[in-house]
Amino acid sequence: MHFSIPETEVRSDENGSSYVAYNIHVNGVLHCRVRYSQLLGLHEQIKKEYGNNVVPAFPPKKIFTLTPAEVDQRREQLEKYMQAVRQDPILGSSEMFNSFLRKAQQETQQIPTEEVQLEIYLSNGQKVKVNILTSDQTEDVLEAVASKLDLPDELVGYFSLFLVQERADGSCTYVRKLQEFELPYVSITSLHSSDYRIILRKSYWDTAYDSDVMDDRVGLNLLYAQTVSDIDRGWILVNKEQHRQLKSLQEKGSKKEFIRLAQTLKYYGYIKFDPCITDFPEKGCHVIVGAGNNELNFHVKLPNEQMKEGSFKVTRMRCWRVTSSQVPVANGTANPSSSSKCDVKLELAFEYLMSKDRLQWVTITSQQAIMMSICLQSMVDELMVKKSGGSIKKQMQKKRLNGSLQRSDSQQAVKSPPILDSPDPNREQVVKLSTKLSSVSLRGLSSSNSAGDISGNDFHGNYAFEGIGDDDL
């Protein structure tokens, strides 16, 4: 997740006294407004709990009123502080930090704690209505959905809630996975748009975990609905013969066999992103990026209209970063949710091991850069858990030992999706046009691009990074 404090506001408290509010943005969207004193209080709590050596530097208190230049300097320092805390594996996942952000989000949006009904969507478009509190965090809502569907406790960790934006043409854009520091009801309500919805989707990448999910009736139905949906939207490539086999299995109600066949298809389990821009293999190339199978897959359109395909393995990414910058927009095109006439430009850049001794930066300019980063991080996390002999099931067992999950008695069946539509003939043409990228002959990132706007820098080292030999290339 990308934290930034791009702006400040002078506001008045209940006594009429003015103060400076620092607007904390997550992924380019306002999450909360906080005062310096609130962040100082958080810092003191963290310092008391974890010690001075662990906690990053915090901007000192000033005796006199700050000048505008000093306010801006403090804004930058607080931004770096929030980014440092969030990126620390201990501090960033601490309940102290996350509860502070949840409370600040609720106070900023001025939403009182009360019982409400929240709609969660399944991949097949089915709505699940859950009764929650406005102050319920993401995990609480996920558990409420699982309870409504009668999904067993041990399978809850295989799924996550995602914020998506529906398009007029029926497609959807995955904005982000909902995090532990936010309140889902507040997050979606604060967007003030019916285009956004929360979707339940599997949260893992390794297809071996499918077997655990398919052993349960509800888990099988959820995975089946997601697979059908991914095929319908063209995320999974299917030729005519494969489509005929899938349709036959669907008509027989053979859901497990349907999924088993789908697992053999290209891009099964991938998340596809909206068309965006990359500097690889050439600057300004249009690209469609997919995340799955521990890689980022590129479908690149070169300046000569030629289509090429290539993949970047997460184990060869030494590190990556997300940067944000404010970009002025023309009159009438500014984002209505923003008070300033600026859009946030997001970039994901990763340093990739192209050959044994050659690292190269590759940059993607996309409003979904954060979601791409989340995908990379979850792939790395999954690889590290597997490397240490762990699994999702073992993690859930530990969680249940620490505290049992509460469930209601209400249940709701997961409906089967409709029969597959006929395959889009244009999808096969894309496969025929694409050829493999040659990493040896392609140019990399220019120095001007790699510098970027580091004021909103979100840097990630990769613990799953592996060296390679020439025989791997």
Curated annotation (Swiss-Prot):
GO terms for molecular function: phosphatidylinositol binding. Pfam families: PX, SNX17-27-31_F1_FERM, SNX17-31_F2_FERM, SNX17_FERM_C. Keywords: Cytoplasm, Cytoplasmic vesicle, Endosome, Lipid-binding, Membrane, Protein transport, Transport. Residues 269-433 are annotated as: PTB-like F3 module. Residues 403-414 have a biased composition (Polar residues). Its main location: cytoplasm. Residues 391-431 are annotated as: Disordered. Residues 1-108 form the PX domain. SUPFAM superfamilies: PX domain (SSF64268). Residues 114-433 are annotated as: FERM-like. Residues 114-205 form the Ras-associating domain. It is found in: Cytoplasm; Early endosome; Cytoplasmic vesicle membrane. Signal peptide: none annotated. This is Sorting nexin-17. It comes from Danio rerio (Zebrafish). The gene is snx17.
